[in-house]
From Swiss-Prot:
This is Pyridoxine 5'-phosphate synthase. It comes from Psychrobacter cryohalolentis (strain ATCC BAA-1226 / DSM 17306 / VKM B-2378 / K5). It catalyses: 3-amino-2-oxopropyl phosphate + 1-deoxy-D-xylulose 5-phosphate = pyridoxine 5'-phosphate + phosphate + 2 H2O + H(+). One of its GO terms (molecular function) is pyridoxine 5'-phosphate synthase activity. The keyword Glycoprotein does not apply. The gene is pdxJ.
Amino acid sequence: MTDTAQILPTTLEQNPQNTSKKPLLGVNVDHVATLRQARGVGYPSPLAAALLCEKAGADGITIHLREDRRHIQDADVYEMAGQLTTRMNLEMAATTEMLDIACQVKPYWVCLVPEKRAELTTEGGLDVAGQLASLTDYVSQLQAAGIKVSLFIDPEDKQIEAAVNCSADAIELHTGSYAEAGLAGKTDRVNVELERIKNAVITAKRLDSKLLVNAGHGLTRDNVHAIAQIDGIYELNIGHALIADALFVGIEQAVIMMKTAMHR
């Protein structure tokens, strides 16, 4: 039986600095919308899934409103903004259209991510260093609207430094290379990628002790524990693997199982 203390969600009124050593769990429900859009019908509901995730102990809900609207739709964003009881984390590209939507909806978090129309999923981190001036202005506009801003980046010193220079509230470290190495059975590469992530957290905290450090992409119950054990990780955002688990055990149990894997 899972310890109840491990599955209680963190609401907006609770300490946003997460003073416990255990990272929070943000659940991405994009692929509930993927299933819906496959038929172009009104079900299943990403909102209903998100509410069940919160009930089961998710500390936040992540959705990615892509420019091509391949899964999450505008209506989903507005619905969730009015009904979630934890934090909404809206992933989006740094475009004028998305800025307008975010400033209307005012999610608790916006996470800026790169987008390519041909990609199946986000393939890498945002090049903050290469577009520092424009992103600094974009981040400041979101923050002026009362929105906290995270930047999805690869675990590289130059990108972390640029994120700090942008005055971002958080970074989310891309764990895709770590996850892919594990799937390929490349143990040595897994260890290398894990060290990169650990060093990135150290660098981030050295440059700005108040910067929150999240992580995500490709995390599963099999590989999440090593990431969750890294000192300084604030939150893990997990979607595809958790929704896949939900097909067999239900979404509430999938959330509980993921938290158990994180904190075992």
